[in-house]
Design a protein with these regions (language model features):
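Residue-level detector of flexible, active-site-proximal loop/helix-junction positions
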Residues: 24-27, 108, 197
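Short, low-complexity, polybasic intrinsically disordered segments
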Residues: 152, 156-198
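Short acidic, S/G/P-rich loop/turn micro-motifs used as interaction or catalytic elements
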Residues: 80-83, 107-110, 164-170
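Catalytic centers of nucleases
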Residues: 85-93, 124
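Conserved catalytic cores of phosphodiester-cleaving nucleases, focusing on short active-site segments
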Residues: 91-93, 98-110
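Basic, amphipathic N-terminal segments that precede the first structured/catalytic domain
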Residues: 1-84
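Catalytic cores of nucleic-acid endonucleases
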Residues: 115-160
Length: 198
């Protein structure tokens, strides 16, 4: 499935040069490099403090494609061409069974106020939602359904944050409502991890 999905992405996204990285080690790291304005996929633990760690016990092939600075030119807000600003996630990571839509928010400090953390989390949800809906639309317009490649249950939106905001069901109704709006718009459940097993 990963090869068919990858081939489809290559057909749909031809405007900007990007790399397709394929690795199959037991431990992998994806991280966002602000200096290079793109994400990287590596076996090196050098940047583990700001990485999404991928546990790959079966050592099967996992693919990484940078979205912001890869599929879409870094900083380009009107990538759809409708004269509106659209956000996008940082990268796609996928194998034959699951597709991860990843947004990194690793540059916050441990003592950052909860309101600021929530602002980062909320913005990350928007980034993932906007790109996911765009990706689905691009697939449909080309005659394919994204869900022919990955079912909703196997599409995992991940916000990679060291320090996540508190979300208590009774005290944070607004935050829970925002997460529910994300779920209603995408039919996906937002996750917050710094480590994930594929």
């Amino acid at each position: 499935m990963r090869n068919a999905f990858c081939a489809k992405v290559e057909l749909l996204f031809t405007d900007n040069p990007y790399d397709i990285e394929r690795l199959s080690d037991a431990i992998l790291y994806a991280y966002d490099c602000k200096e290079s304005q793109r994400t990287f996929f590596t076996t090196s633990a050098e940047f583990r403090e700001k990485s999404l760690k991928i546990i790959n016990n079966s050592q099967h092939e996992i693919v990484h494609i940078c979205v912001d600075g890869g599929l879409i030119q870094y900083g380009l807000e009107d990538y759809i061409g409708d004269a509106r600003k659209h956000a996008r996630c940082d990268c796609l990571i996928f194998d034959d069974n699951r597709l991860l839509l990843v947004e990194f928010k690793m540059d916050v400090e441990p003592l950052t106020k909860d309101k600021t953390l929530w602002g980062n989390f909320s913005h990350a949800m928007t980034q993932i939602k906007d790109f996911y809906l765009y990706l689905k639309d691009r697939f449909l317009k080309s005659g394919d359904d994204l869900h022919a490649f990955y079912a909703n249950i196997n599409i995992i939106p991940i916000i990679c944050m060291k320090y996540t905001p508190n979300i208590h069901p009774k005290r944070n109704a607004q935050r829970n409502n925002e997460k529910e709006k994300f779920r209603m718009a995408t039919n996906l459940k937002i996750q917050s991890f710094c480590e994930y097993g594929l």
